[in-house]
Structure formats: structure tokens, C-alpha cells
């Protein structure tokens, strides 16, 4: 298992350090900071408990492709909620840049896991 820190409690309450709490996971979505190395939309305090994955800090592409159309880029969810709004989360768009959307949209995901 791995301990992941995320704003799990704010519900749109803003960037407050106490809102960033731990979960123990085996299978998880990546956070905005773990992918981009910066925070544009999420709780800025998440970065104090996270690190950017070496794969992304090395400059590798953040673009993911659909399983049923491998030349078609896909939108994919991250686990970071928007600090200022409830029910809205960060995702990666088809250009590989950070974006936001309401959580009831069906987007892809590129999970991490721990064995």
C-alpha cells in the first residue's frame, strides 16, 4: 500500500492545510502536483505532502490515448478537487494540459498502483 495526501475535506472551502488528509491506497488516481509539478486549481497545500513523479518531471508526455482508438487523445481525471468549488475536479486535456470539469462527466483515467 501507499499513503496518498489529497484535499479530502474542503468541499470547495479553499486552500487550507488541514483539508489535506491521508488515505492508504493500492490503486489511485494521480494528483495535479504529481503530474504537473505545480498546482493551478487544487489546494496549494497538497504540494507539501506530494512529489512530482519522475516520469513527468523528465518531460514525458501527459497525453493519454483511448484504448479503442489509440491515435485519439483522451481526457483523463486526476484526484485533486478544485480548492474553491465543490464537485469539480482537475483533469488532463487532450493537449496534455491541466483543466477542470464537474465530476459527473465521464472521462478516462490513468491510475497509479502499488504492489
Segments (PLM) and residue ranges:
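Collagenous Gly-X-Y triple-helix signature in extracellular proteins
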Residues: 1-115
Amino acid at each position: 500500500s501507499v499513503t496518498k495526501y489529497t484535499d479530502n475535506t474542503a468541499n470547495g472551502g479553499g486552500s487550507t492545510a488541514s483539508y489535506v488528509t491521508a488515505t492508504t491506497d493500492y490503486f489511485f488516481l494521480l494528483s495535479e502536483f504529481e503530474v504537473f509539478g505545480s498546482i493551478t486549481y487544487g489546494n496549494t497545500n497538497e504540494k507539501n505532502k506530494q512529489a512530482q513523479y519522475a516520469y513527468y518531471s523528465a518531460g514525458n508526455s501527459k497525453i493519454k490515448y483511448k484504448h479503442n482508438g489509440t491515435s485519439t487523445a483522451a481526457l483523463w481525471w486526476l484526484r485533486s478537487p478544485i480548492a474553491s468549488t465543490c464537485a469539480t475536479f482537475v483533469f488532463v486535456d487532450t493537449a496534455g494540459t491541466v483543466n477542470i470539469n464537474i465530476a459527473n462527466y465521464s472521462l478516462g483515467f490513468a491510475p497509479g498502483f502499488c504492489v
